[in-house]
Amino acid sequence: MAEVFTNALKRSVGVVTTSSSGSIGANATTITGISTAAVAVGYLVDNGNFIGGAKVSVIGAGQVTVDSTSTNTSSTTTQTVNFVGLTTIYASTGQKSILIGGTLANNTTNQVSATVQVSSGSTSYNLLYKVPVPAGSSVVISDAGKTLLNASDEIRVGSSVAISLDVTLSILQGVA
């Protein structure tokens, strides 16, 4: 199979839902006392009590279950929790590919935080996590290195502010 360069482009990336009344138990996987409207399974949990990349795995009435344990050693209340939806920018077409590089451009007048993940099945890995992108500026992905993508991998991007980023990725498809 011949190698082919392609660009993956998305405009206005960013889906965010915020709840400011969360309760998180010590070393817990559940956040209670929150509104779950507009929250979806797979959304990132943005709160200082969970490691980067923690995701919503189950949604219940007024609570969510997270796929990792909280890091706090005692229960905490009135927590602000952001739920960040990831947008799939690139999905492999059944062949190995290489992420050559990319740019995240901030289209807003305020700084935003960007997250870029490679997802392989149900497992995701952060390429960038909560990287600040100044107002009217951009961040370059893989400036010095390349990232190999397996045949079923996806690249997903999230932002701390809704519809705030334009994303361009350069990808070499069909590598052996």
Label the model's feature ranges.
Residues 15-85:
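Small/polar beta-strand repeat architecture
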Residues 44, 115-117, 168-170:
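Beta-strand signatures of extracellular beta-sandwich domains
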Residues 109-130:
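Short, surface-exposed beta-strand/strand-loop-strand elements in extracellular ectodomains
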Residues 147-163:
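Noncatalytic modules at the cell exterior or secretory-pathway interfaces
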Residues 58-60, 131-139:
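Short proline/glycine- and polar residue-rich coil/turn motifs
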Residues 38-40, 133, 149:
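Short, well-ordered loop/turn sites that connect or cap secondary structure elements
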Residues 1-14, 84-107, 159-176:
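C-terminal interaction-tip segments
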Residues 136-152:
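Beta-sandwich interaction modules
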